[in-house]
Amino acid sequence: MESEQLFHRGYYRNSYNSITSASSDEELLDGAGVIMDFQTSEDDNLLDGDTAVGTHYTMTNGGSINSSTHLLDLLDEPIPGVGTYDDFHTIDWVREKCKDRERHRRINSKKKESAWEMTKSLYDAWSGWLVVTLTGLASGALAGLIDIAADWMTDLKEGICLSALWYNHEQCCWGSNETTFEERDKCPQWKTWAELIIGQAEGPGSYIMNYIMYIFWALSFAFLAVSLVKVFAPYACGSGIPEIKTILSGFIIRGYLGKWTLMIKTITLVLAVASGLSLGKEGPLVHVACCCGNIFSYLFPKYSTNEAKKREVLSAASAAGVSVAFGAPIGGVLFSLEEVSYYFPLKTLWRSFFAALVAAFVLRSINPFGNSRLVLFYVEYHTPWYLFELFPFILLGVFGGLWGAFFIRANIAWCRRRKSTKFGKYPVLEVIIVAAITAVIAFPNPYTRLNTSELIKELFTDCGPLESSSLCDYRNDMNASKIVDDIPDRPAGVGVYSAIWQLCLALIFKIIMTVFTFGIKVPSGLFIPSMAIGAIAGRIVGIAVEQLAYFHHDWFIFKEWCEVGADCITPGLYAMVGAAACLGGVTRMTVSLVVIVFELTGGLEYIVPLMAAVMTSKWVGDAFGREGIYEAHIRLNGYPFLDAKEEFTHTTLAADVMRPRRNDPPLAVLTQDNMTVDDIENMINETSYNGFPVIMSKESQRLVGFALRRDLTIAIESARKKQEGIVGSSRVCFAQHTPSLPAESPRPLKLRSILDMSPFTVTDHTPMEIVVDIFRKLGLRQCLVTHNGRLLGIITKKDILRHMAQTANQDPASIMFN
């Protein structure tokens, strides 16, 4: 059926007008940045385009072909495999959209024939909602499982619950009647490793034994994680978001979203988080959700046979991933729209919203943290913010931008060094070394020993009457006779100053270790470490402003709104703003990030501080480089990804960029009726191009169409097996009518059915600024360059990327995938 759809792929599109009459606007193709084949050298994968407007370029339709006639000369039966894609190749967005339109028309035309056809039509219409529902259910369930397992294994580094081995520390002490307010985390049921092994709960011996066991478990978890990744699913490492962006732009990476990757990523994500490495599970949860979406899409023919439609499901899945990662369904939809998706029609927006809703509902039903919230660090603030506080909020934004710029440069430099040195050949050793250093340094400091999510929770939490943290060790010089929600600002006690020093050390530790951790061969997210760094900085700034307001409340900046005994400053709010600023500085997200953090806090009142800090961090970060961390890793890995956010302002023409250039060999082309099967097979074997222009003759150079290498190979192999008389000397005919041949000639092979009759073309005088825009908007892989209808050359996406690198004074070879 797929091949049959391919035959109707839109070769009836005899003019631009036939495209503009498509069934819906989105089908006109807001294409994605389609990627080139990694393994080909020059004329890479080709994509037929549909539209061309403007004065400098034109849309051709196969030279002198009579476009009013039936353009297809179908073979006796469909050719299996034509229209499918190899690994590390780019999908043909236009062909996939045409296949879907043809499928839709065929179903609509048959649905009135019988009740069965009507049922099939309804099933087809609802399959999109069904697949995103299944994706949301699976994403929510897996996220709950990962949260519960990671919490239990994190606490396993410190001790074990004897009454119920599957309880973490907090759950173990829930049912105990022997806990005190000051030591609420201590109960007889929970035993540290020192108590179990040497029978001591206190003292130097106990500390050393707990230290050793902490390092042992951290190294064990890290070693198991990297070993599973290396042996079973190499694609399970890293964040996954750069590759998800690349896949959503049209690239195919077989196995990246497969069942083995899903299984290993889920298991190793728990191990990596529990090992105490400076990483988070939020980014990899997007990869896990996309794996679920990809697997479920194979249950529905509408998506399993159409790569463009499948990417709509993956966009919805990425929204579900962020929804369960942060408990932010709306933020997840905006994240998918702003950060990862390239092609995002309106119906995908609705389905993304629904997938995020279902995933959040499932996670809420599981209640992994026991607090009836979707995340561990949900907080609510009751104190309003004041205009003066915008100044420290903006300073936090500047810090976030500087941190983001530093992190991107340092991490990319380290990852590049890893690729270019022998160190990168020993991923297991690297993970063990990083885990060992992290564990040895982290244990003595209570803030780095904490699970990062718990650290963020503690930094976000406002100091209330029931808080026993050292961050809330203020001197009570007020005669408070009753417990109230809003405790007035007080002078900091010894515990607060001690905590600030520990937080400063934790900040330095987190900054250094995150640079070296992101990119190692275990699942590693960046959201939580970045938020932790910002939250530490924000809490420190918040305490400083709070003490300034307490001791100098008569200053004019405090005098109007901060009275003695009032609760003016909320340090936890500063931590939240700092977390958003640092995450924005690294990823360069804006709208989606503000909404995610707003959904975390449940307070509309703090949107303005968040917006101010996030925008400031983006501006400061952009001053050092416009790329976020994910775009930087895409460029580092050499994925030919044409970023829609980049601007092209140079005044070159298509003729300056096209190949062949001067001193290059001539362009490899096919003629419409002068070549034999052997000629074509020799050309395929001698070149590595992914397709060949078809011209009328070598003399005229008039363009007829374009034939893909894969389609030619499959069609010739199929013809040799199924059609009698096809031999090496058989004439291959791409023309509408077979030319007259001598009687003794072997049977000709008619391949007009695999010919793209409307390849996208531009003239040699088209400005490159327009060509780049066309590639982005239509998701093209290449276009042909003509002059008065005569073929001159070809421009591929790799040519554009090389040209953009040269104009930016970069080495083109350094950005292309090897």
Curated annotation (Swiss-Prot):
Keyword Membrane part of the UniProt annotation? yes
Query: Which stretch carries the motif Selectivity filter part_3?
Result: 525-529
Per the record, what ranges lie on the membrane's Cytoplasmic side?
Answer: 1-125, 625-818
Give TM segment ranges.
126-163, 209-232, 258-276, 282-301, 349-367, 391-416, 423-443, 500-520, 525-544, 606-624
- The UniProt annotation places ATP binding at 689-691, 796-799
* Motif range (Selectivity filter part_1): 238-242
Can you give the residue ranges of the CBS domain?
658-722, 755-812
Q: Does the keyword Nucleus apply?
A: no
The UniProt annotation puts motif Selectivity filter part_2 at 280-284
Q: Where is this site: Mediates proton transfer from the outer aqueous phase to the interior of the protein?
A: 282
* Residues engaged in binding chloride: 239, 527, 630
Q: Name one GO molecular function term.
A: antiporter activity
Question: Which keywords are on file for this protein?
Answer: Antiport, ATP-binding, CBS domain, Cell membrane, Chloride, Endosome, Glycoprotein, Ion transport, Lysosome, Membrane, Nucleotide-binding, Repeat, Transmembrane, Transmembrane helix, Transport
**Oligomer and partners:** Monomer and homodimer. Forms heterodimers with CLCN4.
Instruction: Supply the name of the protein.
Output: H(+)/Cl(-) exchange transporter 3
Q: Which gene encodes it?
A: CLCN3
